[in-house]
């Protein structure tokens, strides 16, 4: 994916605030052989790009001052309650750069699995993304998780995933975490309330 950035001359809180009022987003690009560079981007173009999954988990081509650089999205700051991007960080990469990045999981063949088709169970997606470590040029936009082999009582773990040899899942000390697990469908028990008898009417008192 490609996007355009512009060099940012003025810095500081006041300058960033004025940029945002003008429909721009302040940011920075760092890493590689170049120096950290303050940049600005068009807010609307960036906001719509951020809606695309690939913008978060793939190598991007940034055009800056007539030059093209390969970068990855590193950090993103959003407004607490408004749909506004406040700041964005990018890291320069090349074919020798080894990076750690979270990538989304795409689950496939769930409906065709024995767990769903025959055992009438549900498959719970325990995680929706995984952090991986690999060379930047090998960074996948997503990881495919095949659920077709699951049956009742089974779970799918990180070690069960079919990944390229160059890709390593970062588990942060957790041993073979669960990615998806089969759970039975629990039918709610309908409780029928016993009828309540109305109390007998007492005899009314006559008028004196």
Swiss-Prot record:
It holds the Pfam family Ribosomal_TL5_C. One of its GO terms (cellular component) is cytosolic large ribosomal subunit. InterPro entries: Rbsml_bL25/Gln-tRNA_synth_N (IPR020056), Ribosomal_bL25/Gln-tRNA_synth (IPR011035), Ribosomal_bL25_b-dom (IPR020057), Ribosomal_bL25_C (IPR037121), Ribosomal_bL25_long (IPR001021), Ribosomal_bL25_short (IPR020055), Ribosomal_L25_dom (IPR029751), Ribosomal_uL5_bac-type (IPR020930). Coiled coil: none annotated. One of its GO terms (molecular function) is structural constituent of ribosome. It comes from the Bacteria. Part of the 50S ribosomal subunit; part of the 5S rRNA/L5/L18/L25 subcomplex. Contacts the 5S rRNA. Binds to the 5S rRNA independently of L5 and L18. One of its GO terms (biological process) is translation. It comes from Leptothrix cholodnii (strain ATCC 51168 / LMG 8142 / SP-6) (Leptothrix discophora (strain SP-6)). The gene is rplY. HAMAP family: Ribosomal_bL25, Ribosomal_bL25_CTC. This is Large ribosomal subunit protein bL25. This is one of the proteins that binds to the 5S RNA in the ribosome where it forms part of the central protuberance. Keywords: Ribonucleoprotein, Ribosomal protein, RNA-binding, rRNA-binding. Belongs to the bacterial ribosomal protein bL25 family. CTC subfamily. PANTHER family: RIBOSOMAL PROTEIN L25/GLN-TRNA SYNTHETASE, ANTI-CODON-BINDING DOMAIN-CONTAINING PROTEIN, RIBOSOMAL PROTEIN L25_GLN-TRNA SYNTHETASE, ANTI-CODON-BINDING DOMAIN-CONTAINING PROTEIN.
């Amino acid at each position: 994916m490609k996007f355009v950035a512009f060099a940012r001359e003025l810095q500081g809180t006041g300058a960033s605030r004025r940029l945002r009022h003008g429909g721009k987003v302040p940011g920075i690009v760092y890493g590689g052989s170049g120096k950290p560079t303050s940049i600005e981007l068009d807010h609307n173009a960036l906001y719509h790009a951020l809606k695309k999954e690939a913008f978060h988990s793939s190598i991007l081509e940034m055009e800056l001052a007539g030059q093209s650089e390969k970068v990855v999205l590193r950090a993103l700051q959003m407004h607490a309650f408004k749909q506004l991007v406040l700041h964005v960080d990018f890291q320069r990469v090349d074919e020798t750069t080894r990076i750690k990045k979270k990538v989304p999981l795409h689950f496939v063949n769930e409906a065709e699995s024995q767990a769903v088709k025959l055992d009438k169970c549900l498959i719970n997606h325990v995680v929706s993304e995984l952090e991986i470590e690999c060379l930047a040029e090998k960074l996948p936009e997503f990881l495919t998780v095949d659920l077709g082999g699951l049956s009742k009582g089974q779970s799918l773990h990180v070690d069960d995933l079919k990944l390229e040899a160059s890709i390593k899942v970062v588990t942060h000390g957790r041993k073979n975490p669960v990615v998806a697990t089969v759970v039975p469908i629990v039918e709610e028990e309908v409780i029928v309330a016993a009828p309540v008898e109305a109390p007998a009417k007492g005899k009314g008192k006559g008028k004196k």
